[in-house]
């Protein structure tokens, strides 16, 4: 009997690891075009002679479709086998990217990028939902973030030379090949039975909805704050008289710090209380925003930019893990996918309006972004009260 009881955890281990591999692999590939946006946009302009408006529409289609994938997922997520959904999304993603590599028609390319991102968004929802079912979601979401940043950084390094030889097709064919390599991992997703199992216990539904609403608001506030500041951080450098080459070098190093932030979060996992980790992460993020005030010199600007990038990638896994504790069915993580896209769109739009209304000054933006980050922290801390969590025990 003792031998059998010791064998069970060992048998469960490969399933947990393979699910983690699927989550990290698919989540890294899906947003790769957005993560490599500077290189891809430059190639689209030079090869296809696209102007800023057309390029902007392409990237808006990618981001918009990934977020809009949430809407059909409300229907299929609780009803369809997640593995079957993953296989279908993988097939559509590969087909759309291969066709994108061969088309020379802009309207057709725009449509194909929308379809590719819709399939990718569905995969991202599956990744977010599957991570919520694991025993250590903090670690899973840390690796989820780290995979995206690492592939994006590698792409920014590799793509210019590949574009020189193969053109824009290198990006789209490369994504199709990477997705094909990851395709067998689709069978590692849960089948989605957790949703029906959770709905069978309705006693805490009202309480869970209230907590879910607070979690969604916290996530939205976090993304509005970070995207509003990060979008215009280059403008802060220019207004401070920092050389573009120097600021570019700082941003390149910041990418590595972003990978380090997510990696640190995944290493810590559940070893420390999540409330303390959120406090530390938000303290770093808000300190970075305040360091950007009043035309920082090079050293202060570099410190702020590096600290900002490290802190937000460190915080994000713990935000997602907080949401995962509230709901394991996938519904809340599905909504989170839409909220992330919304926050990334709302933040820069509001920030631009604030900057324009203040004569180009970013002072008020930085102060308000710090307050919004503090609001996000307060909401998240209110969700950290000890409560039973058998799903991850």
Language-model region placement:
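Cytoplasmic helix-loop-helix junction between adjacent transmembrane helices
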Residues: 112-147
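C-terminal transmembrane helical hairpin of 12-TM major facilitator-type secondary transporters
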Residues: 273-319
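Extracytoplasmic gate region of multi-pass secondary transporters
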Residues: 38, 211-252, 256-259
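Conserved MFS/SLC helix-loop-helix module at the cytosolic interface between two early adjacent transmembrane helices
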Residues: 68-105
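Helix-to-loop junctions at the C-terminal end of transmembrane segments
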Residues: 69-82, 261-274, 355
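A late C-terminal transmembrane helix in Major Facilitator Superfamily
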Residues: 326-361, 369
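A membrane-interface helix-boundary motif in multi-pass transporters
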Residues: 51, 161-177, 352-373
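Helix-loop-helix hairpin linking two adjacent transmembrane segments in secondary transporters
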Residues: 134, 143-191
């Amino acid at each position: 009997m003792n031998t059998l009881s010791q064998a069970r955890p060992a048998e469960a281990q490969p399933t947990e690891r393979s699910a983690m591999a699927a989550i990290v692999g698919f989540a890294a590939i899906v947003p790769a075009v957005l993560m490599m946006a500077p290189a891809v946009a430059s190639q689209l302009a030079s090869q296809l002679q696209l102007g800023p408006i057309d390029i902007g529409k392409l990237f808006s289609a990618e981001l918009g479709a990934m977020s809009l994938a949430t809407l059909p997922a409300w229907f299929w997520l609780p009803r369809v086998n997640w593995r079957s959904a993953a296989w279908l999304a993988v097939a559509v993603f590969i087909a759309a990217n291969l066709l994108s590599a061969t088309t020379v028609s802009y309207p057709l390319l725009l449509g194909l990028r929308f379809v590719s991102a819709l399939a990718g968004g569905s995969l991202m929802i599956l990744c977010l939902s599957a991570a919520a079912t694991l025993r250590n979601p903090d670690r899973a979401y840390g690796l989820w973030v780290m995979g995206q940043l690492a592939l994006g950084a590698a792409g920014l390094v590799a793509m210019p030379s590949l574009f020189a030889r193969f053109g824009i097709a290198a990006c789209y064919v490369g994504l199709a090949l990477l997705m094909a390599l990851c395709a067998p991992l689709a069978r590692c997703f849960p089948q989605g039975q957790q949703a029906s199992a959770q709905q069978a216990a309705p006693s805490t539904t009202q309480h869970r909805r209230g907590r879910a609403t607070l979690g969604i608001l916290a996530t939205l506030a976090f993304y509005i704050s970070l995207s509003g500041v990060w979008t215009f951080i280059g403008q802060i450098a220019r207004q401070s008289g920092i050389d573009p080459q120097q600021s570019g070098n700082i941003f390149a190093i910041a990418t590595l710090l972003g990978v380090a932030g997510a990696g640190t979060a995944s290493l810590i996992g559940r070893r420390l209380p999540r409330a303390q980790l959120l406090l530390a992460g938000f303290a770093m993020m808000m300190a970075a925003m305040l360091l950007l005030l009043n035309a920082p010199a090079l050293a202060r600007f570099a410190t702020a930019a590096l600290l900002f990038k490290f802190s937000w990638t460190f915080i994000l896994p713990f935000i997602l893990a907080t949401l995962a504790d509230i709901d394991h069915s996938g519904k809340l993580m599905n909504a989170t996918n839409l909220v992330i896209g919304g926050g990334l769109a709302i933040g820069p739009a509001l920030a631009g309006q604030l900057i324009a209304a203040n004569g180009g000054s970013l002072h008020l933006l930085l102060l308000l972004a710090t307050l919004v980050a503090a609001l996000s922290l307060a909401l998240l801390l209110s969700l950290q009260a000890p409560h039973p969590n058998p799903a991850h025990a």
